[in-house]
């Protein structure tokens, strides 16, 4: 019986890192998603998108929340 390697869907290790670098790491580790850097507090759509990872950053572009698919 063959086992499948699960696709990575969240990146808790990136909290506290630079958002632009985090977005690059996410797209390298999961080529099926587009990582989008978003300043914390800006309005966002509430739709669920399995091809998107939002990387929330503060005013210093530091990741403030766990990036995850959605």
From Swiss-Prot:
This is Protease inhibitor HPI. Monomer and homodimer; disulfide-linked. It comes from the Eukaryota. The modification S-glutathionyl cysteine is found at residue 5. Belongs to the protease inhibitor I13 (potato type I serine protease inhibitor) family. GO terms for biological process: response to wounding. One of its GO terms (molecular function) is serine-type endopeptidase inhibitor activity. It comes from Hevea brasiliensis. Inhibitor of serine proteases, strongly inhibits subtilisin A and weakly inhibits trypsin. Does not inhibit chymotrypsin, papain, pepsin, pronase E, protease type XIII and thermolysin. HPI-1 inhibits subtilisin A with an Ki of 0.21 nM. HPI-2a inhibits subtilisin A with an Ki of 0.08 nM. HPI-2b inhibits subtilisin A with an Ki of 0.1 nM.
